[in-house]
């Protein structure tokens, strides 16, 4: 489709390309898993993806206002890395509250590469500007992603709480053109808290605190801040009753 929409992070327009073809992907995965008592587990996975005609973002020069981002097929691409996941209760530390606490998380460390053909991009999109980096990481790909959760469940089932931390490595958001480098979204450290109280079988009281660290989302170009979004810390209290 050639429809255009605004990216919610950058507010830049993104236009589709009618001739974009489906990406062919060959996956290779190797996984090791260990399940222990009380549901505790750990797993390690290796993966490799070989892609033909991966779908990528390219930048079209803007006459006035923000740049237009177009969607097109690159020539080839690959993604490879390792992922570790785990679930572990904290009862081994001691008695009391430790019996009600658990931690879970996953970390992915990976890399990617795509190859673009400038002339092919021009034929697909009509973009006249020369792509700066014809071999680079995939748009939106971070070399590391970390998700961690500390959870609590009460013995009587009336209370539960979780503290969740997420972070991703810098990633290309706007590919560069005409000799200018790519624009990168910087790591965003997200820390959220959710507490739930179940006074009876039908009711749930929920307290959410989002972005406790007060982090801003930032896009940089050559170590210069291109765009920043201030989100602040959000607090929400809700009540739900199921009939």
Question: At which residue positions do the language-model features occur?
Answer:
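Conserved C-terminal beta-signal and adjacent last beta-strands/turns
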Residues: 23-30, 101-104, 132-243
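Transmembrane beta-strand segments of outer-membrane beta-barrel domains in Gram-negative
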Residues: 34, 59, 76-79
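Residue-level recognition of strand-loop junctions within catalytic nucleotide-signaling folds
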Residues: 35, 49, 89, 200, ...
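Gram-negative outer-membrane beta-barrel transporters
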Residues: 47-50, 68-171
């Amino acid at each position: 489709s050639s429809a255009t929409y605004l990216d919610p992070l950058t507010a830049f327009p993104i236009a589709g390309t009618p001739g974009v073809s489906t990406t062919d992907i060959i996956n290779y995965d190797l996984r090791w898993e260990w399940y222990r008592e009380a549901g505790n587990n750990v797993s390690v996975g290796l993966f490799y993806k070989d892609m033909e005609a991966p779908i990528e973002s390219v930048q079209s020069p803007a006459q006035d206002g923000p740049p237009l981002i177009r969607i097109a097929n690159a020539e080839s691409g690959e993604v490879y890395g390792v992922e570790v996941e785990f679930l572990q209760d904290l009862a081994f530390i001691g008695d009391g509250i430790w019996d009600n606490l658990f931690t879970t998380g996953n970390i992915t460390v990976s890399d990617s590469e795509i190859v673009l053909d400038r002339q092919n991009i021009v034929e697909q999109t009509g973009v006249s500007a020369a792509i700066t980096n014809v071999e680079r990481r995939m748009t939106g790909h971070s070399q590391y992603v970390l998700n961690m959760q500390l959870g609590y469940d009460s013995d009587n089932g009336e209370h539960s709480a979780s503290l969740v931390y997420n972070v991703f490595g810098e990633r290309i958001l706007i590919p560069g053109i005409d000799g200018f480098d790519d624009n990168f979204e910087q790591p965003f450290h997200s820390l959220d808290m959710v507490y739930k109280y179940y006074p009876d079988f039908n009711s749930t009281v929920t307290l959410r605190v989002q972005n406790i660290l007060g982090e801003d989302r930032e896009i940089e170009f050559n170590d210069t801040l291109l765009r920043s979004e201030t989100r602040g810390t959000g607090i929400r209290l809700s009540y739900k009753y199921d009939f």
